[in-house]
Amino acid sequence: MIRLKNGPLSPFILGAMTMAVKEMEANTNVRFYNSSKDDENITVGGTTIKLPNVKVNMQTNASQIEGTGNFGLIGGEQIVWVPQDLNNSNKYTQKEVAAFLMHAFCNAAGMFNEQQRKDRDDYVQIYDSNIKPTCKVCFTKQNSNYTMQGNFDMLSITLASSKAYSINPTSINTITKKGGGLIAKNLELSYSDKYFLNDFYLPYIGRTDNWIELDTIVYYRGSKLSESERVQLQDRLNADRGLYGTPPANGRIERKPWS
């Protein structure tokens, strides 16, 4: 579950964020919790820990990395910086902005960008000198501590389009297909994106107690579990905690809309 909060956003960007959340929750096991009203820290045994929130903010200066520079819920607050240019409904559709945010949320959920795969040079050409200096981290090849599933995915929402992160996005490419073909913006989660996220997440419903409650749709190995399979999995997880039966409804946390 991703603890998601937001700073001041226009209705257009906020709507895109809500759209991104709904799209990911409908197609993957990832669930989001609105942590906007929660404390940022928790104290355990005298030690204060900053909670791993993901916060969506508008970019205010060029030193802030577009999207997120962090991969995985590594502790502390992670910021998703939305470029000011995206706050233009005459230039971008809300779906395009939602795709930008889904990409960032996939990074926060633990996915590296597709162009960071160690085998990327077999499929794409990177033009390093054309990339904004603050965004080069989005192209750093991962050679260790990295899970790579399947073949290189040209449809992944995490794959940069040809002019993404460019010092001159109207004319200069940062990445092309091997051989020079352009890479279009991917606006939806690919099959491989969904498979990866579903491998590492379960669709937990937020609760105030120790019960585990799974949402009505659970994906496993590319398939949706039947209701009986979902309940069996939920029962098994609760039995590991010494809890038996159906999680009581009064323990659920009602998710508030982001505003």
Give residue spans per PLM region.
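Zinc-dependent metalloendopeptidases
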Residues: 1-259
